[in-house]
Amino acid sequence: MASAALAAAPVQAQPVLKIGAIPDQNPEKLNRLYGVLAEELGSKLKVPVRYVPVSNYAAAVSAFRTGSLDLVWFGGLTGVQARLQTPGTRVLAQRDIDAKFTSVFIASGASGLKPFTDAGQLRQLKGKRFTFGSESSTSGRLMPQYFMGRNGVKTTDLAGGRPGFSGSHDATLALVQSGAYEAGALNEQVWRSNVKAGKVNTDKVKVIWRTPPYADYHWVARPGLDQRFGKGFTNRIQQALLSLNPKQPRSALILELFGAKTFIPAKASNYDRIEAVGRQLGKIR
């Protein structure tokens, strides 16, 4: 009887580490990147790891808050929002390029805009059809709007009295290159990767200004992972990210897709300026 009872007892399923990211680029690239990363983390951490895509930036923050995602690649602003909504979270890592990240302003060939030699020339955007990326994007909206404001350009000064919101950096580039918008802002790493991939026609679109640097993307882990997966598990995730080695094929592919040479440690205070700007522009309350 005892053996029968034991046989009937349900087998407890091994917990799955659910990873996610803000959808800042096209879904095909994201599925490839995070699919490979899930395999790498699963191999290093010895637990099942699954990539769970989300529809928009706000959904990434919400899924993290509710526990639908355990580990998320956030932008600067969304990471701050997530940490404020989910006490006890931990910032783990950023890319080598994230400590001094930049956005670029781009313009279509038909816009008449030429490369700016100083930030004051951002005033030339007044009256232009202009698009940001996602409303919650750090590099595609928050910091570009901040620098515009510092140089006397309000969003109400743009054509139609407001900007467009393309939803992603790739979409911003496509819309400006097609002429649907005369100008826009996106993160420089995405611009560079598209140029490298041959997806930019420099006769139709060009960079007109680059922002000063600021801190941006970072990995954030939910609280309670050590309780679910074992003591020290959050530290193990951090080490798995920091140990990605460009000399190993799978790690090299991951780093290439991230546009980085390595991941480095990060901490919440790196994003204090982003929080201050977010509050100033009403994106954090």
Predicted regions and their residues:
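Extracytoplasmic small-molecule ligand-binding "clamshell" domains
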Residues: 13-78
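An extracytoplasmic/periplasmic, membrane-proximal ligand-sensing/linker region
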Residues: 14-17, 25-36, 220-221, 225-285
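A bilobed periplasmic-binding-protein/Venus flytrap-type ligand-binding module shared by bacterial periplasmic
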Residues: 23, 103-115, 215-229
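Ligand-binding cleft/hinge of the Venus flytrap
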Residues: 36-46, 139-165, 195-201, 276-284
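Short helix-initiation/N-cap motifs at beta->coil->alpha
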Residues: 51-62, 75-77, 155-174, 215
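A ligand-binding cleft/hinge motif common to bilobed small-molecule-binding domains
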Residues: 73-86, 149-150, 175-178, 182-202
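Short beta-strand->loop
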Residues: 89-98, 158-162, 195-213
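A conserved helix-loop-strand patch within extracytoplasmic ligand-binding domains
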Residues: 95-151, 157
